[in-house]
Amino acid sequence: LQTYPGVFTGIGEFSVHKEFVSAKVSGDVASLIDPALDRIFDFTAESGLLSILHTDIHMPFVKPEFKRLYFDQALDLFRRHPKSTIIWAHTGLGRVVQPVADHLAMLEEILADPALKHVYFDISWDEVAKYVVATPDATRLTAALIEKYPDRFLMGSDNVALTEPQALFAVFNQYQPLWDA
């Protein structure tokens, strides 16, 4: 940051609980309760860098009694770092981690909490788009949440293996039912 001032704006692409990716990394398995993660967020607060956190909102193939485990750990992390700007990539979803029945309610729990106004959600992935436009109800409810909190949702370029601009536009276009809602 001192060598190239103004060049870097954030820390992206770091994963904690991300489907089966986290288990493939050598060394200790990342965790939302690991003090090392606190040091990263302390640094982002101190330096003014934002962070894009890739972590699942729940476990793959989650059983109902465990659906809030990762979510509650994320809430605790967010509360410990109120001066860090945090973007939760893909609203915590993925190829295997699909929305549970109250997924949007969980997001709204964060959005409605004034102590968590530093947390944003990125929706730029074709897997997320599939869930959002899967049914008219899913699209309508997502649109209502975005309309209620329009400054907390981001559509960026965080798409897996993006090789050309047309791929980015294809993801954007998948959301057309949401844009029309």
Model-assigned labels for residue ranges:
Residues 50, 82-85:
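Short, proline-centered helix/strand-breaking motifs
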Residues 3, 32, 62-69, 98-99, ...:
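Extracytoplasmic/periplasmic, Sec-exported soluble proteins
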Residues 1-9, 39-46, 76-82, 107-116, ...:
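Acidic (Asp/Glu)-rich catalytic clusters
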Residues 85-181:
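H/E-rich (His + Asp/Glu) clusters that bind or coordinate divalent metals
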Residues 26-37, 66-73, 101-106, 135-141:
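Charged helix-capping and loop-helix junction motifs
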Residues 12, 28, 61-62, 95, ...:
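Conserved short-loop catalytic and cofactor-binding motifs
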Residues 53, 62, 66, 89, ...:
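Single, functionally critical "micro-switch" positions that shape active/binding sites
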Residues 1-59, 120, 125:
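Active-site gating/metal-coordination segments in enzymes
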